[in-house]
Amino acid sequence: MKNKPLLLLFLVVGLTVDSLAQSVFIQQTQPSRQSAYAAQQLASALTAKRYVLRSKSQSVDYTIRLEQPNSQLGPEAYAVDKQNKQITITGGDGRGLIYGSLSVVEDIQNGVALAQLKSRREQPHLPFRAIKFDLPWDTYRHSDALDLHYDTCRDTLYWKAFLDMMVANRFNALSLWNLHPYTFMIRPTNFPAATPFNDQQLAEWQSLFRAIFRMANERAIDTYLIPFNIFTSPEFSKAYNVNPKLNNLDHHHFIDGDTSEIVKRYTRECVTQVLQEYPELTGFGLTLGEAMGGMTPQQRENWMKATIIDGMRLAGRKTKLVHRIPFSSTTGSLGVTSIDTEKLTRKSIESEAALPFIEGPIWADLKYNWSHAHSTPTLVKVHGGKLFDTYFKPDPTTYKITWTVRNEDFFCLRWGVPDFVRAHVAANNQSYVGGYFLGSETYIPAKDYFTTPGSPVDWRYAFERQWLFYKLWGRLLYNPTTPDAVFSAEFVRRYGSSASRLLEAYSLASSTPLRLASAFDFTWDFSLYSEGMMGFDANKNVSYISVNQLTTQPTLDPNYVSVNDYVKTITASGSFGKEKITPPVLAKMLETDCQKALQLVRSINTSANRSLLYEVADVKVWANLGLHLAEKLQGAVALQTYRTTGQEPQKQEAIQHLKAALRYWDDVVAITRPLYNDMPLVHLAEQKGHTWEENNKLRFHWAKLRPAVVKDIELAENAQPISAK
């Protein structure tokens, strides 16, 4: 036999490996859903590293003992103690046991042998770390960018993967949002025609939600159902509503509220029935604003008490509560903040917390820097404007403030700036802060509609592309002292030692959207889309940010200086303090960081790994966008100086900077065109002068914006001094 020596060698090597494989017994001292999940995760990691699992403790090399919870450790805390051949993992509760087990799993996956495993302890910094997940059915906004996730989000395999990601990153709550969730979950006993599905279809929906809540419970993840208000199903309106004029069949947001008794009764009974039929659902949420026009803040609170709060009471069990702080102090759905509304809301929250069927603390939620928290860690505003101190003084005892960190700024490009997250957490370390929501309203992290067809990649779902985003936020909310080495090690585990520089590269390059959003003031979702360098234009359409708009737009961060204010001050022989980030300073920061990021990834060989190719490419895209912005800022300063002073060299300098900005934009296009599809984008759904159907066909890609980038050069070439106009 020609290959007999080779076969014998293979058998000898195989026997040697097997004989050296160490055996492990995993012991659950107090079996539960959570300990079973922890044991399964440990088992998977161990077998992947060629450890042999045993069902009995006799003659094994190692015993991993999952100890019963020890409340003295505190909620969600854990201890890993290694004594010789026994590793004991103890949690302050079931959640802590899972976290301790996952910390060991992480070591195993990173190649740490059980012999080298170190004892450790960890406890949570913030008790509430939630994902805001907008479901793709009966969505708040309407776009192909949301509808395309429908099938993915009806697949329990997707939810298993998403919940695994959540618990691995220490997120402990999943909040599910849509306009009117009830009729996807129940057939209301007294309003059966409100549900649009037949029995088989409804059973499929119910099976989905029960699976989500069951899997979340296994992972010690709380679940919240957060409907918008006041909405009913179209089928309810047609069958039962006695006032057809108030029928909101298309679920418009900014209309008068239907405060009829039948709608109150229907909503209340739906809440009760959902809580009774889904015992693993942890809590509910209140949102005050949409379809509540014509109502005062007090009337909105009263409606909530008569429906959702009373529905919770009638369910006959304890329920947790998220009370989203209202953003309108007027009878309009889009109002402004006020001290009076804050006082009214605080009183309502504290009265809810006193109810025996509500499990405290109540999470009182606010949007951090409106819809674009990926800007500055400094709190400048909330939805509706200024935040007063009513919710904080005196210090609340029955509720905690949670901050919603919205991401409406980057969906395609990967992101990761650990020091930004740490700074955010450090800025919100007050005793009244309970935690964070993290999520979007214009994006659902389900189907990957970005990646062009090609050779295989390591991800199936969109959120898996953004693993660093979730890992940074989740782990640093749990423990902000988690070192960068943890995140760098994940790059190395995935792609090998050459990827060890990627965390630093991302930290530098993906600071670009943070700096743009700090320098370019915004309000709601569509007002800024950082990865596209897009925002509201003068007509309130979403378009590429022109050099004129970059010049005149106020800044968000009070330490930043706009182009207009900078030129006005400098031409008047004024100056700025060292703490101020002027356009030239910002341009230099962008140039320095983005050039260094490009240098860090220049030598990484991606030819044999398409997934690594995308990771490196996104660093390059962010870096080139940052360099584009740096040139554009310098061009804007020169152009505005020319307009103010009439100095011709300033005009020529502006043209040269804007031409350089175009070259960097062309680099972005060259990188992204073969990698990314033309993408649907919710931000384009309400462009004025077009029908919804026309807007829904619009697609985003950097290549599509090139003509607008060229227009900046033409604008500079045709510019005239202000005095000559």
Label every PLM stretch briefly:
Residues 51-76:
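Short, well-ordered secondary-structure micro-motifs within conserved domains or adaptor modules
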